[in-house]
């Protein structure tokens, strides 16, 4: 069926509600809009669903959410796991509570109990809830840091991590097999509750989740000594982090926490920012203003679903605030956690620091310094979660810390997704620890550069929307795959990792070996002097991302090298546009 026929079927089928049909009636005659909304089903990929909210098969709406949930329910029943139920959380976005209930009622109609949070909660708490409740799966309604018009649907498995093989492909196949939207099961909320298939959760998960975070604290003595002297500015960017971040900091004894008032309350419009992303400087405008006003030591921002943390720290010498990238904050927290664990308890022989392939090589230097394993995984925190599960199942490997360059880390194993609530807590604890040594977090960062090397990493991306954009993204990857650059920015390419073909090719010797990781459409160029470039299509946005890293002899040298390599990458992009 073509897009026009699908459009007509939605427009005329009484199964679809009046508001949906009115929205579709309003685009009658607009061929481009009709095609964009109906040329495909919103793809249920390895990250679940993510798309613009609206009527149509290629949009986020109650019908696409029901379809995805019916596919998930079919898979759960297929593997005989329906007795354990599914936990459901949601963020502050438009339609998030409605989508959560639609998912719950579809599960209930399939005989699967849904545990639904009473109000918005952070992503990592959903991961924790799946484990705590012993659920088969979890659903999180969120589009993370995407613009306001987006929403999404992420699926977790029983270990609390987002779905990985074989469950991801199994669920994707079942979702694809649901072709008739009107055949999807649902039931009234009151009946689901009466039948014991819809249960509200809240404080019964919040309290043990916060307790698990507090178990991670290594130096309560330092917090007790100097917490009253530390000034912390925090913004939840209109999202889910407000209550849990403030709660855990307060319970530990941090009394000077200033919340950005304009961004404190949940709001799906994200009215103070165009893009609620803690990677973006714009997201910190209000936080920085408040930070300067109260003379804050550090400024924290969590994204709407509170799994990623952005940070600015004060330089006591100049009074300026420095932005920490996800690589910098991840290494700062990781070095603190691993270093203090070694000092207090010693490190296990099989201890491991896990990072994604696009994260900084400083992590490798930290692991080498402490004599622990550095393990690389594909991009996506689910692969870090998968590694923790592997450690538990084999009895080989002890998880110490995991991080991604995209501002996410996990300092414990209570959950299996990145946790900005825990990261905020650990960073504040680290600030207290270093303060007892007369150091700031910026001083600690400079000391890490001295110890491990001056690593500088960056990422740039090109956005290519719609049908044409999808084709262009594939064209770019094909061009690079067929014509690998011999050098980029003066750095000679010494090896090419093609994760789609599962090959690492030494460019000088021509020797080929496997990557050892699952296949993925990613190209990675190892280069001279420790430089590297990695190219991959985003799994959640219509973008191609270009990551790069260098190592310098000083901060200034690393900055200059990074800037030069970034220019070379942009020049490479220009040749393909």
Task: Provide a role label for each language-model segment.
Residues 85-91, 231-234, 410, 549:
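Short glycine-rich or small-residue beta-strand-to-loop segments that form or flank ligand, phosphate
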Residues 292, 296-298, 320-322, 340-536, ...:
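Phosphate-binding and adjacent anionic-ligand microenvironments
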Residues 38-58, 143-146, 232, 236-248, ...:
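Conserved phosphate/anionic-ligand binding catalytic regions in large, soluble enzymes, centered on
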Residues 156-186, 327-350, 355-363, 420:
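Glycine-rich phosphate-binding loop plus the immediately following alpha-helix
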Residues 33-38, 42, 151-285, 289-290:
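Gly/Ser/Thr-enriched, mixed-charge loops and adjacent short helices
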Residues 99-107, 150-157, 307-327, 363-366:
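Short Gly/Thr/Asp-enriched flexible loops that form oxyanion-binding sites at enzyme active sites
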